[in-house]
Amino acid sequence: MVKYSQEPDNITKSCKARGADLRVHFKNTRETAHAIRKLPLNKAKRYLEDVIAHKQAIPFTRFCRGVGRTAQAKNRHSNGQGRWPAKSAQFVLDLLKNAESNAEVKGLDVDALFISHIQVNQAAKQRRRTYRAHGRINPYMSNPCHIELILSEKEEPVKKEPETQLAAKSKKGASS
């Protein structure tokens, strides 16, 4: 069994999915995962489909040097830097669908699910080579990643009982 970096609070009301050594850029996937963190499942799926169709952008916050600005990213509460990493969005969307299937098998309410945990880790780099002038060879590396996510059902908070008026306390030393 594979170890997740975090276990869900309520195992019976959550489901998990993960992908290892995925051939998709780590940096783009990290930004994609950060954009959908804590979203409800149906909103996250719709958002990623819009990213693939270039209708909404993923705001880039950490790996953003040289990233151009777009109005679509400004709408997502960032400084305007954003892109449309379609391959990363597709990989994360596939994992969300996998986790949704796991939830259906477990008998969870799919409409009440939200992304309680999503994490992207760097995987071992894959090495290739490119041939340069004068007989030189340079590395041509890819940066794959591991993705893990946990979907949980929203728990309704316990409602506080309305306070009833209590009888006033009498003092111990007072005589009646």
Curated annotation (Swiss-Prot):
Organism encoding this protein: Arabidopsis thaliana
Keywords: Ribonucleoprotein, Ribosomal protein
Protein name: Large ribosomal subunit protein uL22z
Coiled coil regions, renumbered to chain: none
Region (Disordered): 154-176
The family this protein is said to belong to: Belongs to the universal ribosomal protein uL22 family.
Gene: RPL17A
One Gene Ontology CC term in the entry: vacuole
UniProt keyword Ribonucleoprotein present: yes
GO biological process, one term: translation
Composition-biased stretches (Basic and acidic residues): 154-163
One Pfam family this sequence matches: Ribosomal_L22
Gene3D superfamilies tied to this protein: Ribosomal protein L22/L17
Entry GO MF terms: mRNA binding; structural constituent of ribosome
